[in-house]
């Protein structure tokens, strides 16, 4: 007879089985409810995050666009400031060059004034006088030195200002380049989208790079660079106006002094020509007086010789009558007449000798004074020649260098004109 073989195992009770089924069913429902809740929350989260992401992307795109507009406006302001600054640098450089040319041009008047002073050092004797011409020439040298000093000061100021303008331009240019690069970067960022092929995850993109500044610092720095450049341009404009005024004033002062100096030269030349004519007239009269005195001396000498002959005759007669014999040797009327004649002749001869001596002394005095007159005439001729050469030299100040032809050369000869007798005499005496 067959037997039932039963593996021994624990047996659950029916309530346990029922409880297990209930728990499974209950847990299934609870898990489904939890899953449903998670699904609902996930849907809400997805919607919210999608909306937030879309909004954030739109908001940041708007911010990027606004930032691009802001940087673009600053870039345009910097563009204008740089353009104005470049124009001002060119204008100031041209004004500085003009001042340098004016400074260089002052060398010619200075050389001419010094040459005139040097030429006038060749005056002789009494003509070496501190006259108005010399005073005006010294004043001209002082005016030229003062104008050169003023121009040199303005040139130095322009050089320093150009350096400051270049420095401001470098700051503006650096700021401008930075904004150009920023615009390129931000425009590139604005052009990116979700389908762009070059987007990727980066390592710590939210880090704050070293050297970062706040928006206020950025705005302050940009404004400072712009304001600094504009302030330097304003100062440069004022300096340009001051340089132009200095050039005009120095040219006017120098021209006024040139006119005053040449007026003094012309006045002095007229004075010397008048005195030269007076001295020549005195020389002519003195020469005529000398000639007349020579003639009178000759007549005196002839009269003296005749009187000596008359005296010899009287002496001979008186001497001969001393040999009359005996009583014939009497003092008769003839004797008294001859004696009186001798005394008269001796007095006449003495008077003639005295007058001849006086005439000789007068002649010597006339010759000495004539020598002084001629020496002074030579001095005046020399002085007039020197001042004429000075006036000719000063023509360089008004005649272009390529058209300048000296009227008086270094050998005291004149060219290209006919000399007056007075000028010819001046050159001969010189």
UniProtKB/Swiss-Prot annotation:
Location within or outside the cell: Cytoplasm, Cytoskeleton, Cilium axoneme; Cytoplasm, Cytoskeleton, Flagellum axoneme; Cytoplasm, Cytoskeleton, Microtubule organizing center
Role according to the record: Microtubule inner protein (MIP) part of the dynein-decorated doublet microtubules (DMTs) in cilia and flagellar axoneme. Plays a key role in the assembly or attachment of the inner dynein arm to microtubules in sperm flagella and tracheal cilia. Forms filamentous polymers in the walls of ciliary and flagellar microtubules.
The protein's name in its UniProt record: Tektin-2
One biological process term in Gene Ontology: cilium movement involved in cell motility
Cystine residue pairs: none
Family: Belongs to the tektin family.
Domain of life, per lineage: Eukaryota
InterPro entries tied to this protein: Tektin-like, Tektins
Post-translational modification, as annotated: Tyrosine phosphorylated. Ubiquitinated, leading to its degradation. Deubiquitinated by USP16, promoting its stability.
Keywords: Cell projection, Cilium, Coiled coil, Cytoplasm, Cytoskeleton, Flagellum, Microtubule, Phosphoprotein, Ubl conjugation
Subunit structure: Microtubule inner protein component of sperm flagellar doublet microtubules. May interact with CCDC172.
Pfam families: Tektin (PF03148)
Keyword Ubl conjugation found: yes
A GO cellular component entry from the record: microtubule cytoskeleton
Tissue: Expressed in trachea multiciliated cells.
Ranges in coiled-coil conformation: 81-162, 265-379
